Amino acid sequence: MGGSDENRHGVIGPMNRQQGGLRGGKVIPTNGQTRRALSNINKNIIGAPVYPCAVKRPFTEKNGICNKKIPPVPVHRPVTRKFAAQLAENNLQIHKEETKKPDLISNEALDRIITDVEEGDFNEPMFVQHTEAMLEEIDKMEGIEMQDSNDIDAEVEESVMDIDSCDKNNPLSVVEYINDIYCFYKKNECRSCVPPNYMENQHDINERMRGILFDWLIEVHYKFELMEETLYLTINLIDRFLAVHQHIARKKLQLVGVTAMLLACKYEEVSVPVVDDLILISDKAYTRTEILDMEKLMANTLQFNFCLPTPYVFMRRFLKAAQSDKKLELLSFFMIELCLVEYEMLQYTPSQLAASAIYTAQSTLKGYEDWSKTSEFHSGYTEEALLECSRKMVGLHHKAGTGKLTGVHRKYNTSKFGYAARIEPAGFLLL
């Protein structure tokens, strides 16, 4: 270096045996100057940082009083650990600010750059890729959550209750195949139906006489305290017999009714009324022989087929699906017994009559149309499919206490049947 000669190679002189007999060589500087002080060694190192040193400046009154901004004078001080950390932190902040400053590039230059660079040659920074991946994942999660919430809402709205879960430990409920049993009933209920105009083939009786007979049989059934199944089977046997045997005299119509009740009692009841009781209830209009002969004729005509689904079979299942209480149950049976007397209601199947009776009773008690998904599932009928039949039931409810055929109204106007006949009809269903 120009300012120091201490790094230049010296010359080793020859051995001078005369001067003290030195065995080693002596380093002779070329310029004869001695080595500089050690304190200035930093100047001789290439690229070495300059050590700061404190420079004291005198304090002037002018500088202390004046409000003018005086450019700061660089202070040279020894580098301690704390001071070095501050310097490193300042350099880091400056570096961050420089990286944040966008490069000003003209549009033409930018276009050229974008045109020249291919998509596959440019890699996005890792933090950008991670951010995009996180956003995509969040979007997916939000989509899944929205879909799950929609599915949950749909499940809540369209959920069908397991109405047989409470009877799993009851072997008499046959929970394992109860649904198969009712599917079989639905398929075979058409066999228990009769043509809705079969009275046109009768020569001596009509639908009004049929209604009188059924209204009387409902009172007889109530006085004998028979099972509900017996009443519905009695009505079914009479209609099926009259639909096939087309030459029944008017004076024999009551005999057909009494005999049908006897057959139904033998099929359903544990304790069957004796023939003499039936003769007495018919005011001794028929003899024992006539009743037994009609019994044989009816059994042969119907081919001993008494096991067919009636509206009562479906009523029990549909009431369970509707989670009915006693009030709803009594009003539903009141509705459907009104239909038994009416000839025009033969156009509906037993299952449709049962579902319509429950739907009408629910709407009557609640004051609005009500038909749950569970009831729809187990009955197989939507609310729209029941409206026509339900409106006719409301009409029958309106006139139940009027006219000559009031047996059903008197029966359900007692405390035993919860005074169901006194409930106001659901007139809003007629609108």
UniProtKB/Swiss-Prot annotation:
Pfam families, per database record: Cyclin_C, Cyclin_N
An example molecular function term from Gene Ontology annotations: cyclin-dependent protein serine/threonine kinase regulator activity
GO biological process: cell division; mitotic cell cycle phase transition
Presence of the UniProt keyword Membrane in the record: no
Keywords for this protein: Cell cycle, Cell division, Cyclin
Signal peptide range: none
Family listed: Belongs to the cyclin family. Cyclin AB subfamily.
Subunit relationships: Interacts with SMR11.
Listed name of the protein: Cyclin-B2-4
Organism: Arabidopsis thaliana
Gene: CYCB2-4
